[in-house]
Amino acid sequence: MNPCNTLFIFLRRTRWLAFCLLLGSVCAVTAQNITQTLTLNPGWNSVFLEVSPPNPAVGLVFSDPSISSVWEPVVRVTTVSFIQNQNEVPFNRGGWAVYVPTNRPESINNNLFSVRPNHAYLVNVSGTQPVQLTLTGQPSVRQLAFEPDAFTLRGFPVDPASPPTFQQFFASSPAHYNAGSGALQRIYRLKNTSSQWEAVSPGDHLNRNEAYWVYTSGSSSFDGPVSVTPSVGDSLNFGATADEKELTLMNSTAHPLAITISGFGAANLPLAYYAVPTNSLLRSWIPFSGNYTLNVPGGATQRLRFGIQRGQMTNDNFGAVLSVSDGAGSVRYVSVLAQRPAPVVGKSGLARGTHQPLDGGGTGIPVE
């Protein structure tokens, strides 16, 4: 028997309900997380965080003793001179939030205390050996705005199996690419061996986990050819009462894209999606078999409805991750969470709150 289930039953029997609910969330916590691995070379590294660690304290996330400092820009950067040489000391320290290990005297000036997903950091590594960091946390698909008419330090959800070129990736973003002239806005990547920022060419490829100085003309929150937006918050969180959640997919390119949604590292998820089955003209709830591909026309937005099948949940708390690949060089990860509602005993002594099939007027989404 699942140890989480065993403890849950024991605690429920002893009526420690509040503690039991807390324990249940801990048992399920790893299922909706992903792991991000960062390889840091000696010298300066420009990295992009995709996950939200359970404890975001910068000293815990970047705890390797070879890491000598972590920096995040906090001012509006409009000139290349601000970012030109990473080895200048101090390099515009007033424009940065900084962390150094607390065993060093200069840590008294620390003003960077926690990390955030979808944010970029410069990390300085001392010594001669690379450092590998393994970060586990909930992924984020929240779009962040670029600084208008300025540089922003930013990374992107690159598919490492088929990384796009900068021109391919930004072609559908007028703030970063001029389709008329074919000119890409200024973008710089950090060359680790020299600690120098170098301009990228349109045909260069992006890397996952790497952050770049990107100039944005006007306002933009572009993060790829396809944006992925949950109906509420940063995940598909059904809680204990919601039965449906939407995932909005917007194709900003001029051509259709086949977008594939897959269960990441898991199969037989208790989910259904609302679509037109093969050999049918009517939409209906279809069990999610682990993969679903839909074609989104160029410039179009599609909303995909997901339903939770609580009757198929093997625990009172469910967590999983969906990957969303646009086939154009980017992939995102979306957490899925759900709970079974606690039964409510009515005056008759019968438990209430049992979910019924959707077409039966109840609140569940079983499709059988």
Predicted features along the sequence, with ranges:
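Bacterial N-terminal signal peptides that target proteins for export
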Residues: 2-18
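Bacterial N-terminal signal peptides
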Residues: 16-26
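Boundary/junction segments of secreted and surface-exposed precursor proteins
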Residues: 28-54, 345-368
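N-terminal exported-region signature
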Residues: 31-226, 302
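Short, solvent-exposed loop/turn segments enriched in Ser/Thr/Gly
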Residues: 115-119, 207-208, 239-247, 302, ...
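Long, low-complexity ectodomains and other extracytoplasmic segments of secretory-pathway proteins
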Residues: 225-256, 264-285, 324-368
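Intrinsically disordered, low-complexity Pro/Gly/Ser/Thr-rich segments with frequent PxxP/GP/PP motifs
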Residues: 271-312
